[in-house]
């Protein structure tokens, strides 16, 4: 009872990280609700399933490309509980937005650059400040 679900879950987790909700959906579709919950309980007890660790790793791997709003949306879409998301997300920093902006091809166009940063999840104020700093640094921004 549940050993097939547990083995399947371990195979999935060996390939990539999953949030509890995402793994629960996969297991429930294949084995049913009761077996899925039993397997998830065992995985959590063994330390193989942890939403906080998953969210931290997710943010670490994507923080260079996305701002906090985008990361928040991605984590919530993957079923990470909101309290965990709020705990692991960093505050939007102008330095991070500036680093992203430096890699952007159309950085000389203010409107495009700010829209780009907003699309990456940076708040408008942070995007504007990053653009202003880049302009002051004299990196060819207009």
From Swiss-Prot:
<dbReference type="Pfam" id="PF02631">
    <property type="entry name" value="RecX_HTH2"/>
</dbReference>
<dbReference type="GO" id="GO:0006282">
    <property type="term" value="P:regulation of DNA repair"/>
</dbReference>
<comment type="function">
    <text>Modulates RecA activity.</text>
</comment>
<dbReference type="InterPro" id="IPR053924">
    <property type="entry name" value="RecX_HTH_2nd"/>
</dbReference>
<dbReference type="InterPro" id="IPR053926">
    <property type="entry name" value="RecX_HTH_1st"/>
</dbReference>
<dbReference type="InterPro" id="IPR003783">
    <property type="entry name" value="Regulatory_RecX"/>
</dbReference>
<dbReference type="GO" id="GO:0005737">
    <property type="term" value="C:cytoplasm"/>
</dbReference>
<dbReference type="InterPro" id="IPR036388">
    <property type="entry name" value="WH-like_DNA-bd_sf"/>
</dbReference>
<keyword id="KW-0963">Cytoplasm</keyword>
<protein>
    <recommendedName>
        <fullName>Regulatory protein RecX</fullName>
    </recommendedName>
</protein>
<dbReference type="Pfam" id="PF21982">
    <property type="entry name" value="RecX_HTH1"/>
</dbReference>
<comment type="similarity">
    <text>Belongs to the RecX family.</text>
</comment>
